[in-house]
Amino acid sequence: DRSETQEKAHPVMQLLSAAGYFALARFDDPKAVLARPQPKLPYLTAAWHYARGEVFAKQGDLTGLKAEIAALEAMKIPPQGADESKAPDQMVAIVRLVLTGRLAMSEGRWVDAQTAFRSAAEIEETEDFMQFSDPPAFWYPVRRDYAAALLAAGDKAGAKRELEATLKLRPKDPVATAMLAGLAS
């Protein structure tokens, strides 16, 4: 709750605090997520839009999902100094691309979903982002969504390849493991 009223925080601290919004999107009551006030800090605002977008995607509310994507695209975050971590800005790009992929999947646009998820995974897997924190700064390996988009388009071999790549980076990811087992059966 403090993150919603705080007016100053280093971008890296905001990125770490964003995990709270990721958890809310996954586990909290959708009405509670949508009722949360917009934070004042820019990177937390991006995480807030992401959480709301995930709720809208789960509810099939494509209008709401599109509004959250548009809000992320319109965000103007002051550039970091040259010595600063790129991870906070990368997080904003990841959440925007993940929601873009969710929208494309909801609309049956498999190639667009693949493009969005692949781009998000590539950012998530950069050295700057991967080395930023342990556990990883983003809550799940986006490459598994890329695999899901490939599978939705009928590309089982591509999905298998991407799930195996996911498990090289996060060997115990339960969703990627289950998806890979499902392909084998």
Language model features with spans:
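"A position-specific structural signal for the A-helix of alpha-solenoid helical repeats
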Residues: 19, 47, 51, 92-95, ...
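Solenoid-like repeat scaffolds
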Residues: 1-9, 35-44, 72-89, 121-133, ...
